Amino acid sequence: MQETGQKIMKLFDIPAYIIGDTCWGSCDLNTHAADMLGADLLFNIGHTISMETIDKKVIMINAYDDVNFDIVVEKYAKDRANQKYKILGIITDSQHLNQLQPSRKILENHGFKTVIGDGKGQLNDGQVFGCEFYPAYDIQKRVDAYIFLGQSMFHSVSIAMSTEKPTFMLDPYFNEFQQVNDKARVMEKKTILSIYKAQEATKIGIIIGLKEGQFSKIKALKFKKSLEVLGKDIQLIALTEITEERLRNFKGIDAYIQVACPRIAIDNHFTKPVLSVPQAEALIKVLKKEPMDDFLKLRHWL
């Protein structure tokens, strides 16, 4: 990226800035920074989605990891040749989309049947985000198990939690594979525990994310209204980065609901309960003395 930026400046005699802040996905493009810099175009490299552009000035550039999956897929296919899971859904994340078809061919050469789910919205066929799982969820009745191509425990565990199907993560860097359903059950128990802890809260902070693709003010206000009816005192908060350190600045709040990104609540450690949108919806059901049902078994957690 640094080299590309310098080449643009030399070839076209225009300023080219590298935005050095974190970027967690197409929900986190930092167009505010581009506007402040007076940039006419913003290139996002690597967060592959089904669209080439977002807004008028954002251009999405596909970039794939060049790691090869052949060894780990062969290893899985040979080790699991006699297993009961014969129809496999193949799923991956943005940087490994180019490995779907080669991996599919290997599995089918070993006698497995494979299914790659259709994309929806920003998702390509066979692609999942950390918060959206349409290509996995929509084929669950057609498959025995899922293969996730990549090293992301969060993505693979999310597939297992949203579908309750056997899910295997194939890691091409260490050429190892593992079933992640036990980890999914542990994570689900943690999410349920947070809900019951939040049930006891007197004052709940509802956090609105200020990143452009995570801004859900209407949903936050809807939760505010529902929880106030149920007797909770509500504090509305707006944050760009939701971290334990920043939440420590707020006093007298017993639990939080953040409507920005489900990964924040599920992935990170917080001293006080921090709920995602599905957890918040389950909390409202619990407060109404209703069963929370399968609150994570959804196509998306937004």
Predicted regions and their residues:
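Redox- and metal-dependent alpha/beta enzyme cores, enriched for Fe-S-associated oxidoreductases
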Residues: 154-234, 241-250
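Structural motif
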Residues: 40-41, 45-47, 63, 90-96, 144-145, 149-152, 255, ...
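Metallocofactor- and cofactor-centric catalytic cores in central/energy metabolism, strongly enriched
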Residues: 1-36, 41, 46, 243-246
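Short, charged N-terminal beta->alpha structural module
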Residues: 1-15, 91-118, 209-236
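A C-terminal functional module that forms or caps the active site or interfaces directly
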Residues: 218-275, 280, 292-293
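Peripheral docking tails and interdomain loops at the edges
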Residues: 173-177, 182, 262-302
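Conserved, well-structured core segments that form the ligand-binding/active-site neighborhood
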Residues: 53-184, 196
